[in-house]
Amino acid sequence: MGSTPVRMPKLAVAMSEGTLVEWLVGEGDAVADGQALYVVETDKVEAEVPSSTSGVVHLTGTPGETYPVGAELGWIEAGP
């Protein structure tokens, strides 16, 4: 079993950071591939970000905090 990082996405060419507005899932929740995980806000857009895989999610990012593109906000542990 492995894990997949949950990262701050690059939603626009000029985007260098984004704010984690809220988690749409809880610590330890089972998530499906494509399920909305969290909301990101930039100076131009607010968007839901989907999971890239299924498994159990672990959250490390704090809502209200700003993170650079690529920063790890948590990870998804592959399920059985």
Q: What is the predicted function of each stretch?
A:
Residues 1-80:
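Mobile cofactor-carrier "swinging-arm" domains
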